């Protein structure tokens, strides 16, 4: 019950903190497709303005994740810019939903998380930046064969051309399984990737 109330409070705070400007920071005007690779994982991610799903002043994302063990995770999120001036730092918060088909039979998971995404521009001329996110789904909002979900990532980004960027970083992505099943680590390693804006 406490977890549920805490999550609802966070959602209210998130809703009251979003920016009201017409052109908030870090909301892409067009579309972006990212391809992320590590030794054991592949992820394809699509980013666009939330207008595509009928929500103004937001950013929508959808992703397909595949591990070497043939774990498949689909996710979708909607984040909103925080209404504070942090200079070179942009902060977005919002929910993200995960649907996982794990390689073990009958080990499927659905989770509704809340998190934050940050991006800090190190060099404005080069648009060199560090970025990261943190999402957590508590037991009360995690269904199926897991009790909770944790998804953390940090990366360095650098533009390669007007429409393309390169990035590299580290991701920690795991479920705590039910009935003493331990921890299911989907990713715990370095990755590299490319992003294309159009």
PLM regions and their residue ranges:
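Sec-dependent signal peptide recognition
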Residues: 2-10
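N-terminal signal peptide c-region/cleavage motif recognized by signal peptidases
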Residues: 14-16
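Short glycine/proline- and aromatic-enriched beta-strand/turn motifs that initiate or cap beta-hairpins
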Residues: 18-75
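Short, surface-exposed loop and linker segments with low hydrophobicity and enrichment for Pro/Ser/Thr
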Residues: 20-28, 81-86, 90
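Hydrophobic, lipid-facing positions within transmembrane beta-strands of outer-membrane proteins
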Residues: 31, 40-44, 58-60, 72-78, ...
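Outer-membrane beta-barrel transmembrane domain signature
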Residues: 50, 82-91, 98-198
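Extended hydrophobic secondary-structure segments that form protein cores and membrane-embedded regions
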Residues: 61-63, 92-97
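Intrinsically disordered, glycine/charged-rich N-terminal periplasmic/extracytoplasmic linker segments
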Residues: 70-76, 80-83, 91
